[in-house]
């Protein structure tokens, strides 16, 4: 029967209302980043949710959940061929169950069943039932499963006695029991069918009632909700075939919640889950099942969800070398709770389709530990075998991802996690490092909670990050794959268990007084509803790799109580080689801070290898771990050289349903009045560290000299990282750290280059003063020898004095040459100190000097250049300025600058001869003294004259209003527009208050500027960084003519602009054929003179003329000042393209900016004005919607330039 629901339609209507009332500007998203769930598509596609597929309707009642009866024979054949390895795993699981029925069968008595956590019984039923379906001849197994289900159906309920408020065990039991019932339906007698079905009905009804009152019914993206909703859906689907409309209500409830889940997951651009890998595998198990069931039963297609496309990396990039252990962010065991082989084969079959999922599932199964703490729990190890069998696609040949075999850095910008060396075999050279500094709930959830774009989200009440840890700025280190520093995994939420800093004495300490760690600690679950905890956040400042060197840093001050009066808790990690890790803590506190002590912790869970005290070079205290005579060492010191002894402790903590042992090194430092800096060095057995010390510790940053394997490395790290000018001054570029050694300097985020001089430092083997003293002593000794000779051999006094004079002159000359070659200062007594100090500052800036960037963005209107705002918006490094706006307008010049496009090129000679003085002064003011320029803008209420001017500027748009609205209404509307523009100026001013060194980014809306970049070059000089955005002419013309109603072509009044292009109006000068006219526009002028020219032809000639002229004119600009960027590259390859743009600017791409551009290009949740949603699919929508004759016309006109830019022909 067709299942239609008014309730579901009501849900859609509420969603439409919620999105229609969403504010324009949200969090780190610009005013164009409007969250939209593609309501039109939602309506057309998802109102059919409850219309079962006709195929299912016509087939037998059961099985129908994951497959129908007609597929069983094929599944049995696969068990002997392509699926043999999975069948063997299922058969092995069943053999183990049959060998120990006392353990695996549900207890005969309900009291025993309810006495402990009992998810094992629901989890093991589906693979057992699938085996019986594949091997109906195995009567022993079938009798076993009947006894299994008879016992479960005989219980009065499936609750756990000591957890009466937790329905998760019921959810597992219901999912398993209903799935097994569906699989075995045709093998059961009628009595059992009816009895089992009644039990499923009763339990499903209970779950539905619980969903209305329990927190899991409201808390999204949480493992409890996903688990219980899948249970409710499974029960509804199984009973709904036989029972009526009540089951449909249950289905509706699940779909409403799970579609919200999928919608929110789409905001998470990196495929992660905030609950960590272990619980993430738990939630993902249910999400993949929902996606499959929703498509199979309701025709709901979520396979384009961006989170699913990225979720593979959540498993691959968190794996330590050897494929057995994962990084344990948040509550975790050593790897996964459920799967992840099932999730991986699902992703491969339906999303990736490249064999990578099958390959990783294969590696994980191959390397599964047979014993020890990393063995999967008996309650969970087989729970996803049935879905893995059903989803496995043998046609996808297992193959690793691209670049497999080389250690790579992977950044999860939403999660706030960086890993290095993941997904590799366990060999001596494969090292793993992880770093965590993220926002509570992940960036997307955090922003949604704080900026409330959706009315159906009730702040933190709609989420449950209770499994997260107080772990901002935490890290792990496994040189050679041997875990040296690990997390403490599942346990109480205490900061000292998470390798982060704690402080004392703190007035707000809630446990371990007087010490206090990060917000939300001190309980079994993170107290995310506590005071200030909802605002807790860390931030990864930078993450970059060059060769085997990695630099990562994070700020965690917002994760600590404001009562501690901390200004910065900045931690930097530098992996120098596969076995040497330098960790630096920079702590800055306010003058009235009560804190005077800081304590660091480093954990290891491996009971076989214990930490013992160690002393480095009899100078610094440390600790060592002996792994079969291989020594892994650490030591520490502050910027004064202090190195206190550590306390090495062991502890047992509650974890899941057991105790887990841990050990940790705890070292406490006394803090300085304002700034405290501490360095920790971790290194493996094949490394010789011979010295390590601070050589600079100033306000902007620090330098550490570290001698590793007889090579000196000078590490420079900026701690005033928000200040771009400070970074340029301290390092010579816009990054955050550099490493110099004898011959090269590595600038993290930009690259490595050779340096002319070897590293020089203040330890000089033969200083000048020492040489001078040696020379004087040598002269005296030789003089005494000569006197002795004179006395012994009676030499004449005259001859003696001649010899002495010659000797003195010779020695003086030699000393003079030595001074000439070494002394670089006028007063040589200061040579050693001055040169040493100078070397500190020059080490990092050795080589090519870079200027602070002044960014200019230009393009033809409609080319999508506005998307670059996502790279620069809400950044401490940049101030994104739209030009023009009501208050930032371009002054008039000798030549008119058309607001759409013109054909005038400004030559260097014209600029240098004194033209455009007013415009030149305006630009210098806006760029070089931005703060003063903005302050001098008077934000007064616009008078009638200003309104009239505004009307004139927008006359095309206003004609529409005049037909519909009265003059007072128009004035009111214009006043509102001016109010928005005034608030825009105030926002720019506020940004400069927080980040005074932010560099301006001028986004020029007129296409006229594409031919005038030489003007910016002359005014701004070497600091100019021009980004010229081009777009496929077919996509551009489609966007201009068809992508919005009314079209951009009409709104911009393009025909009028083109008609004015070659005219002279009102005495205003225009460039002509003899002066400043770009000759590429001549074909367009001829086209305009034709009476039958159409819009497509005109726009094609316009694109060709403007683009060709811009490419010719801008060829003269240096590659360091000008870069062409294709809009399609930004959308299709956002990370690669934006990294190239930021390298051009001399600044590393931050994870926050990366997250913003990924959100804008990958989620279908971001749109540009007149453009609609931005996604790789939508950039090619012209291929489906643009008439073929128009495509051919565009290609005929533009082909030469299209080919040069790399745009292929479509009509071929």
Swiss-Prot record:
Species for this entry: Homo sapiens (Human)
Glycan attachment positions: 28, 666, 688, 709, 874
Claim: Transmembrane is one of the keywords in the record: yes
UniProt protein name: Dermatan-sulfate epimerase-like protein
EC number of this enzyme: 5.1.-.-
Subcellular localization: Membrane
UniProt keywords, alphabetically: Glycoprotein, Isomerase, Membrane, Signal, Transmembrane, Transmembrane helix
UniProt membrane topology term: Multi-pass membrane protein
Gene Ontology molecular function terms on file: chondroitin-glucuronate 5-epimerase activity; sulfotransferase activity
Transmembrane segments: 764-784, 803-823
InterPro entries from the UniProt entry: Chondroitin_lyas, Dermatan-Sulfate_Isomerase, P-loop_NTPase, Sulfotransferase_dom
Phylogenetic classification of the source organism: Eukaryota, Metazoa, Chordata, Craniata, Vertebrata
Pfam families per the UniProt record, alphabetical: Sulfotransfer_1
Broadest EC class assigned to this enzyme: isomerase
Signal peptide coordinates: 1-20
């Amino acid at each position: 029967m067709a299942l239609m629901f008014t309730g579901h339609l009501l849900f859609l209507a509420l969603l439409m209302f919620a999105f229609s009332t969403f504010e324009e500007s949200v969090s780190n998203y610009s005013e164009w980043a409007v969250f939209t769930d593609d309501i039109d598509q939602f309506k057309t596609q998802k109102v059919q949710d409850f219309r079962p597929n006709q195929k299912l309707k016509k087939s037998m009642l059961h099985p129908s959940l994951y497959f129908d009866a007609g597929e069983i024979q094929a599944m049995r054949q696969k068990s002997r061929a392509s699926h043999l390895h999975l069948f063997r795993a299922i058969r092995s699981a069943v053999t183990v169950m049959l060998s120990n029925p006392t353990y695996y069968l549900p207890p005969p008595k309900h009291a025993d069943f309810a006495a402990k956590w009992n998810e094992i019984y629901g989890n093991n039923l589906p693979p057992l039932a699938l085996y019986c379906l594949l091997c109906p001849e195995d009567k022993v197994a079938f009798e076993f499963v009947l006894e299994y289900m008879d016992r479960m159906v005989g219980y009065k309920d499936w609750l756990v006695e000591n957890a009466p408020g937790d329905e998760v065990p019921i959810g597992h039991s219901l999912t398993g029991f209903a799935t097994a019932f569906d699989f075995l339906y045709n093998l059961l007698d009628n009595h059992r069918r009816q009895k089992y079905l009644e039990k499923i009905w009763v339990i499903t009804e209970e779950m539905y009632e619980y969903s209305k009152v329990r927190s899991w019914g409201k808390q999204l993206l949480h493992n409890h909700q996903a688990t219980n909703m899948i249970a409710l859906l499974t029960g509804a689907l199984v009973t709904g075939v036989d029972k009526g409309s009540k089951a449909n209500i249950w289905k509706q409830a699940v779909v409403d919640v799970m579609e919200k889940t999928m919608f929110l997951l789409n905001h998470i651009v990196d495929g992660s889950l905030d609950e960590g890998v272990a619980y993430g595998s738990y939630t993902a198990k249910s999400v993949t099942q929902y996606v499959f069931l929703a498509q199979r039963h309701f025709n709901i297609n979520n396979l384009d969800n961006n989170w699913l496309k990225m979720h593979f990396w959540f498993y691959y990039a968190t794996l330590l070398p050897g494929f057995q252990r994962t990084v344990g962010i948040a509550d975790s065991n050593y790897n996964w709770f459920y799967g992840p082989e099932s999730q991986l084969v699902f992703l491969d079959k339906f999303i990736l389709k490249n064999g990578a999922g099958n390959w990783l599932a294969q590696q994980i199964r191959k390397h599964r530990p047979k014993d020890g703490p990393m063995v999967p729990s008996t309650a969970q190890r087989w729970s996803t075998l049935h879905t893995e069998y059903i989803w496995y696609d043998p046609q996808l040949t297992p193959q690793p991802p691209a670049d497999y075999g080389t250690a790579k850095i992977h950044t999860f910008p939403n999660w706030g996690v960086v890993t290095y060396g993941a997904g590799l075999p366990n060999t001596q050279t494969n090292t793993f490092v992880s770093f965590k500094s993220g926002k509570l709930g992940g960036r997307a959830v955090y922003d949604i909670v704080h900026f409330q774009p959706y009315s159906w989200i009730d702040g933190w009440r709609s989420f449950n990050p209770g499994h997260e840890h107080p772990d901002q700025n935490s890290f792990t280190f496994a040189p050679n794959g041997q875990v040296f520093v690990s997390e403490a995994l599942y346990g109480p939420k205490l900061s000292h268990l998470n390798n982060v800093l704690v402080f004392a004495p703190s007035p707000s300490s809630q446990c371990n007084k007087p010490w206090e760690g990060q917000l939300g600690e001190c309980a079994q679950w993170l107290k995310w509803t506590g005071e200030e905890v909802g605002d807790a956040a860390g931030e990864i400042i930078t993450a970059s790799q060059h060769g085997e060197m990695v630099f990562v840093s994070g700020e965690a001050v917002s994760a600590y109580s404001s009562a501690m009066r901390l200004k910065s808790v900045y931690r930097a990690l530098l992996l120098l080689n596969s076995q040497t890790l330098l960790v630096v803590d920079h702590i800055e506190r306010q003058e009235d801070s009560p804190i005077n002590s800081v304590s660091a912790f480093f954990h290891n869970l491996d009971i076989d290898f214990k930490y013992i005290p160690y002393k480095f070079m009899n100078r610094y205290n440390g600790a060592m771990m002996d792994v079969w005579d291989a020594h892994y060492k650490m030591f520490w010191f502050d910027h004064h050289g202090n190195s206190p002894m550590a306390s090495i402790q062991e502890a047992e903590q509650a974890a899941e349903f057991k105790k887990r042992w841990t050990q940790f090194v705890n070292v406490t430092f006394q803090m300085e009045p304002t700034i405290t800096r501490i360095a920790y060095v971790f290194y493996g057995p094949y490394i010789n560290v011979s010295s390590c010390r601070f050589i600079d510790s100033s306000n902007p940053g620090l330098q550490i000299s570290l001698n590793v394997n007889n090579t000196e490395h000078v590490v420079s790290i900026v701690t005033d990282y928000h200040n771009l000018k400070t970074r340029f001054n301290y390092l010579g570029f816009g990054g955050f750290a550099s490493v110099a050694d004898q011959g090269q300097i590595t600038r993290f985020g930009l690259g490595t280059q050779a340096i002319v001089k070897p590293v020089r430092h203040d330890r000089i083997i033969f200083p000048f003063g020492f040489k001078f003293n040696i020379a004087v002593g040598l002269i005296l000794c030789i003089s005494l020898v000569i006197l002795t000779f004179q006395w012994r051999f009676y030499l004449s006094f005259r001859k003696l004095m001649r010899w002495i004079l010659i000797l003195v002159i010779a020695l003086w000359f030699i000393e003079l040459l030595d001074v000439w070659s070494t002394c670089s200062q006028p007063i040589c007594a200061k040579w050693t100190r001055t040169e040493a100090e100078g070397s500190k500052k020059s080490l990092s800036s050795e080589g090519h000097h870079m200027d602070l960037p002044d960014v200019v963005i230009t393009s033809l209107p409609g080319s999508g250049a506005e998307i670059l705002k996502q790279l620069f918006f809400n950044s401490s490094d940049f101030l994104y300025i739209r030009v023009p706006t009501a208050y930032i307008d371009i002054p008039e010049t000798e030549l008119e600058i058309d607001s759409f496009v013109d054909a005038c090129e400004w030559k260097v000679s014209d600029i240098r001869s004194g033209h455009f003085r007013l415009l030149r002064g305006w630009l210098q003011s806006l760029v070089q003294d931005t703060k003063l320029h903005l302050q001098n803008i008077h934000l007064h209420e616009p008078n009638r004259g200003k309104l009239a001017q505004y009307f004139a500027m927008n006359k095309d748009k206003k004609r529409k209003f005049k037909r519909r609205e009265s003059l007072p209404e128009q004035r009111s509307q214009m006043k509102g527009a001016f109010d928005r523009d005034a608030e825009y100026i105030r926002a720019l001013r506020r940004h400069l208050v927080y980040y005074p060194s932010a560099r301006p980014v001028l986004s020029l809306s007129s296409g006229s500027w594409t031919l005038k970049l030489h003007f910016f070059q002359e005014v701004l000089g070497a600091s100019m960084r021009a980004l010229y955005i081009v777009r496929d002419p077919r996509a551009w013309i489609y966007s201009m003519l068809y992508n919005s109603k009314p079209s951009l072509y009409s709104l911009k009044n393009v025909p009028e602009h083109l008609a004015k292009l070659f005219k002279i109006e009102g005495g205003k000068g225009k460039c002509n054929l003899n002066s400043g006219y770009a000759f590429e526009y001549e074909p367009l002028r001829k086209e305009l003179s034709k009476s039958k020219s159409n819009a497509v032809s005109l726009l094609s000639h316009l694109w060709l003329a403007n683009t060709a002229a811009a490419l010719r004119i801008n060829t003269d600009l240096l590659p360091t000042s000008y870069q062409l960027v294709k809009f399609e590259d930004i959308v299709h390859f956002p990370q690669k393209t934006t990294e190239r743009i930021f390298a051009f600017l001399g600044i590393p791409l931050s994870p926050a900016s990366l997250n913003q551009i990924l959100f804008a290009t990958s989620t279908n949740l971001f749109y540009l004005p007149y453009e609609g949603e931005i996604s790789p699919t939508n950039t090619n929508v012209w291929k489906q919607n643009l008439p073929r004759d128009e495509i051919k016309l565009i290609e005929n006109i533009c082909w030469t330039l299209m080919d040069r830019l790399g745009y292929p022909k479509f009509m071929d």
